[in-house]
Amino acid sequence: MKLTYKELEIELELAGLLAVEELVLTQGLNCHAGLTLKILIEEEQRDELVTMSSDAGVTVRELEKTNGQVVFRGKLETVSARRENGLFYLYLEAWSYTMDWDRVKKSRSFQNGALTYMEVVQRVLSGYGQSGVTDHATGGACIPEFLLQYEESDWVFLRRLASHFGTYLLADATDACGKVYFGVPEISYGTVLDRQGYTMEKDMLHYARVLENEGVLSQEASCWNVTVRFFLRMWETLTFNGIEAVVTAMRLHTEKGELVYSYVLARRAGIRREKEKNPGIFGMSIPATVMERSGNRIRVHFEIDPEYEASEKTKYFTYAIESSSFYCMPEEGSQVHIYFPDHDEQGAVAVHAIRSGEGAS
């Protein structure tokens, strides 16, 4: 059924709802879009609604400025009913469909250096139906020799890949399936904000760690928190007091019975980030089987991978010499461990050969 709340229309795959009392809609860089609702209901429908609400879809449309454009699509995650001052309310929490990518931690490797980043992304998303990605960062670049997803959800892994280009994973919360922008898109509707009240922030630590080394001026690290009385689209480029800025976060919420639109605006050149690494691999080793040898290097089939993908650009790992008095390269079919001395998988080396049929020492 459909309910109208201020300038928004909320459509839920539920019946028997009376009125929306409160709403909070949030979105930002590297985040799923989230929606919470407080809805007045009849007492006798309380238990039925809580039971029926699991995985129900929810759509929010903006009626005033965009003439019904979808601003959020997702599905319910948590539902509860409460009695307050003699009335019964349903409390709902929903997330964009990208949340499905963030539920299960997975481990696998990508060792074919001929793969592009987008080919890896498509492989990662292949199990999510119509989910997809729009590339605004890679320019068709190939991966380094080796990528490792280890005990990471697909969302976290893709977020980390985006950081290889100094950019972010941005949820497209308007689609009825999981979709993202890989990097900040260039979207403009000609919006101009003049003489708006705001607070300005400048993250000098972020500037020193990320932007300064790229030759970006310090003023590019500025961002503005603005509150307006109308809807702005996420990721759109607009003119703010004569400055070109991008909408990088929003929070629509109820305040004293009114719907308040709060946004963060940032200069495009300042929307950069450090390379994200996987803290879980530091000092870790993964069992593998030797598939090929070349000098003091080996190609391996990781135990975490269902099959070995042979190619001309499959990663060779250097085999580390563990003893100065005795040196013997492992044979094909031998068991080894791939050791990760730090948080970056690119530093991995092969160690500790075990002949087939022998136990680990």
Predicted regions and their residues:
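Amphipathic alpha-helical and helix-coil boundary elements used as assembly
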Residues: 1-361
